[in-house]
Amino acid sequence: MIDPAGIYLIDKPAGITSNGCLSIIKRKLGIKKAGHSGTLDPMATGLMVVATGRYTRLLTDIITDTKSYSGTFSIGFETNTLDIEGEVVRRVEAAVDPRLIESAAEAFLGESDQLPPKVSAIKVQGKRAYDLERSNVEFELATRRVVVSDFTISYRPELDCFGFDLACSSGTYVRSLVRDVAYSCATLGTLLQLRRTKIGSFDVEEAVAPEAVTADLKISMSRALSSFQRIFVSKVVADDLFMGRRIPAGDLTALVSPSDDRIAVFLEPEAAGASLDGHDPPLVGFVRMLDGWLKPESMFPLA
């Protein structure tokens, strides 16, 4: 039986929450613990990187700061949620040249301070902003620094809306970006559709539906940790690291570049034996190389 603990690429469908998606995955895999790479609104679809079991701790290590999206938006009206699922609260009748909207994208490249939507999961004094907003409680959200590294907008006359492709930092609210693009052109904007297409090097084309997930569909740890330098150690060394002992780096110093970054440690293939399950040797954990020693930092005892 394949151990279900691991990293999975999931294509979230529309109409369910991100936590609802996790519930399906936990049921399908028969596990109790799972986490994901960042919330997608119920109306949104696309890539979620899901970690299960003991590997939920890996999420902060494998999720890069850049996420990519595609979607559509309309102008001339705004909802209370800034997307099509909310109630229309404002309209403007003035016509706007589509070319003005298309050219506005360039002004949003780079760093900027973004005001999140009030209907969001941000906590305000211990309560979710969306709960406060729905209870008609007055509150203000702080702006947050975001980075947009790529952004293109194109008018779709057959649908009378605008399509976009976007790469941005984690924590960017696409609904707010659409709002701000519209404001910059003296109109209003509302998100119609949103699909997350990439998280770092992970692509939605590799993902599976939550209902289709099985333990053999988890990605290899070498793929999950492709941004890390890596070394392979014997079972004896792995056991010492699990005990929190520093290990002389010895010949391993020639296998990694000098750096203060953490190094991923795997069990040697011959030591892993039958536990491979067709995947890479098991992850032992992370170390730093300091003054010729391997210092354990975050370890993952073998199942």
Regions found by a protein language model. Name each.
Residues 1-176, 180-205, 286:
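RNA pseudouridine synthases
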Residues 1-13, 19-36, 40, 44-47, ...:
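Accessory RNA 3′-end/elbow-binding domains used by RNA modification enzymes
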